[in-house]
Structures are given as structure tokens and as C-alpha cells.
From Swiss-Prot:
Protein name according to UniProt: N-acylneuraminate-9-phosphatase
Keywords, in A-Z order: Carbohydrate metabolism, Hydrolase, Magnesium, Metal-binding
SUPFAM superfamilies: HAD-like
Cross-referenced CDD domains: HAD_Neu5Ac-Pase_like
UniProt organism field: Rattus norvegicus (Rat)
Membrane-spanning segments: none
EC number: 3.1.3.29
Protein's pathway: Amino-sugar metabolism; N-acetylneuraminate biosynthesis
Family: Belongs to the HAD-like hydrolase superfamily. NANP family.
Length: 248
């Protein structure tokens, strides 16, 4: 780490600032209710949702040749067909997808204490939101949680040539804020993208949001710092700056 003070903080979005996993679970529960009450599915409803969750976790598509709506509707269509058999049911798949999507967006919110933290931090440093993912999906989340006003810039991986952990997207973020990599801290919950990316780009520090309290594998990227909640960040940044003051 360099000896300059922190001038900018890059934040991941999903499961760092907003509870994307929790919102997705709420969406799945609504779909289960729909399938059981309207279509009289029984345990198959949960099986279908479990299958979709697996497909989402393995999702891979080219954003310039494929529409995310089509891709995710197909996840539901395939899961229904695999579970129930018979002919494909695109209409039901669309109903499930849009219910899941709308429900989870409703529950993607910035908590009041997170808003307060961002507001206070921005008085001292520049803030940037750096999120991987499909452009449409991530922009919908950003709109849903109304976080735009808390950041000096927002960068969506799906709109760039490369996503995290490629160093190029971090350099782009630095250019937007007029800072050097050694001035910046990356905060996120994913070792393979947020932390590895910050290390690749030579940022001042990386902060891993480790909500589960698990220990990183020896083969995993090693963050400079680890906290259980993003709300611990202000105190950590003060500590980092204090170390700089003592070193110069």
C-alpha cells in the first residue's frame, strides 16, 4: 500500500450495499406462491425455483447478441419443462420471470444507515459505484435502490470492454475521478472479482465484506482488510489514514 491518504472509495453494489440475495429469495417465494395457488403445483414449485437458481448461478451470455430478458425467461421455461415435462410453456415462464424480477427489485433498497454512511463519507472522499453484470439488469437495480445521488460516478461492467477483475475497468474508474490507483480503496463481497480486481489494478487497499465470517481459501485472493459489514468502513478508513500519518 502507498503512503498517500485515501482519496476515493469504489463500492460494489450487489450484497455489498444492497441485499440482492435476500431480494432474490423473496422473489422466488412469490413465484412459489403463484405456482401453488394459481397453477396447483405442489412440491414441484420449489423444485422449479431451485433449478432456476442454479441456472442463474451458472449464467453466461454475450450482452451484445442476447437479451437478458430472453435468457432468464428461458431459465424458467427450461426449469418448468425439466420438472413437469410436456410441451414448453413460454407464457408461464414469462409470468414467473417477471414476478420474480419485479418482486426482487421492490426489495432492493439502500438501508438508512447505509445512506447515512455514504453521505458522511462523501464529505471526505470521492465515491464510485462499480458493479459487474448486464447493463439492463444493473441499471434497473440502481434505479430501484435510488443510489445515484450518493456517488460521484457509476460504472457498470456490462457497459465496458472488460469487467472486474480486469485492471482496465479500475483504471477507467480512476480516470473518471481524477485519481491514481494508489489513492483508492475497493470495497466488495466477492474475492474473485472485487478483491482480485483491486489487487490487479494496484489499488491502495481492498476491503472484503465477509458477512458469513468464513475464512478465505489459501488459493483465494487475499484482501488487505476484512469486515463483517460495510458499516464498519468509516472506522477502517480512519485507521488506514492514521497509518499513513504515522509513516510520513
Amino acid at each position: 500500500m502507498g503512503l498517500s491518504r485515501v482519496r476515493a472509495v469504489f463500492f460494489d453494489l450487489d450484497n455489498t450495499l444492497i441485499d440482492t440475495a435476500g431480494a432474490s429469495r423473496r422473489g422466488m417465494l412469490e413465484v412459489i406462491k403463484l405456482l401453488q395457488s394459481k397453477y396447483h403445483y405442489k412440491e414441484e414449485a420449489e423444485v422449479i425455483c431451485d433449478k432456476v437458481q442454479v441456472k442463474l448461478s451458472k449464467e453466461c451470455f454475450h450482452p451484445y447478441s442476447t437479451c437478458i430478458t430472453d435468457v432468464r425467461t428461458s431459465h424458467w421455461e427450461e426449469a418448468i419443462q425439466e420438472t413437469k415435462g410436456g410441451a414448453d410453456n413460454r407464457k408461464l415462464a414469462e409470468e414467473c420471470y417477471f414476478l420474480w424480477k419485479s418482486t426482487r427489485l421492490q426489495h432492493m433498497t439502500l438501508e438508512e444507515d447505509v445512506k447515512a454512511m455514504l453521505t458522511e463519507l462523501r464529505k471526505e472522499v470521492r465515491l464510485l459505484l462499480l458493479t459487474n453484470g448486464d447493463r439492463q439488469t444493473q441499471r434497473e437495480k440502481i434505479e430501484a435502490c435510488a443510489c445515484q445521488s450518493y456517488f460521484d460516478a457509476i460504472v457498470v461492467g456490462g457497459e465496458q470492454k472488460e469487467e472486474k477483475p480486469a485492471p482496465s475497468i479500475f483504471y477507467h474508474c480512476c480516470d473518471l475521478l481524477g485519481v491514481q490507483p494508489g489513492d483508492c480503496v475497493m470495497v466488495g463481497d466477492t474475492l474473485e472479482t472485487d478483491i482480485q480486481g483491486g489487487l490487479n489494478a494496484g489499488l491502495k487497499a481492498t476491503v472484503w465484506i465477509n458477512k458469513s465470517g468464513g475464512v478465505p481459501l489459501t488459493s483465494s485472493p487475499m484482501p488487505h482488510y476484512m469486515v463483517s459489514s460495510v458499516l464498519e468502513l468509516p472506522a477502517l478508513l480512519q485507521s488506514i489514514d492514521c497509518k499513513v500519518s504515522m509513516s510520513v
